[in-house]
Amino acid sequence: MANVSIHPAVDGGVVHGSTEGFAGGTLQCLCASNKVTVDVASQSAHNHACGCSKCWKPEGAKFSVVAVAPRDKVTVTAHPEKLKIVDESATIQRHACTGCGVHLYGRIENKDHAFYGLDFIHTELSQQSGWSPPGFAAFVSSIIETGTPPDQMDGVRARLTELGLTPYDCLSPALMDALSTNVARHKGLLH
């Protein structure tokens, strides 16, 4: 299954280096100069390969690799004027560089959303090592929407499994539980 390319950051195997004591780093867009930079003063969490059609993916990748960090730990530190929200109607407001198109971070503004307070980040845009490694794959079937033939899906899922990235056609069970818990709390069923 090694011939199925997922994403450059995981195609050679998921690296499980030391994350102990890692306190974050800086993300940079791909422009040659006047780079947008975003400081993330926190370790990432829930890092995963995402097959949705909205996340930024490097050229040729079927999946993005995306994680979350606390919103209050994510700060644009250079060239904020180059950032534009990709789709203002989307739940996740993805802030992309107008120069190179890279998504620097995604933010949820709906305070009632289960993931409010978490910003979505692409740790591959950082020179620092120590970020949490990808641990699963989400929205796997969605890669069909971006052109992957359905008859290749068994191979894609097998490759994800081979890489240790359990494939889900939604989010991981822990994240789905968080979404459902949030709904139940808003209904007054849980406290």
Swiss-Prot record:
Binds 2 Zn(2+) ions per subunit. Pfam families: GFA. Zn(2+) 2 binds at residues 50, 52, 55. Its EC number is 4.4.1.22. It comes from the Bacteria. It is an enzyme of class 4 (lyase). Disulfide bonds: none annotated. It catalyses: S-(hydroxymethyl)glutathione = glutathione + formaldehyde. One of its GO terms (molecular function) is S-(hydroxymethyl)glutathione synthase activity. Zn(2+) 1 binds at residues 29, 31, 97, 100. Pathway: One-carbon metabolism; formaldehyde degradation; formate from formaldehyde (glutathione route): step 1/3. GO terms for biological process: formaldehyde catabolic process. Residues 22-169 form the CENP-V/GFA domain. Its cofactor is Zn(2+). Keywords: Lyase, Metal-binding, Zinc. Catalyzes the condensation of formaldehyde and glutathione to S-hydroxymethylglutathione. Belongs to the Gfa family. This is Glutathione-dependent formaldehyde-activating enzyme. It comes from Xanthomonas campestris pv. campestris (strain ATCC 33913 / DSM 3586 / NCPPB 528 / LMG 568 / P 25). The gene is gfa.
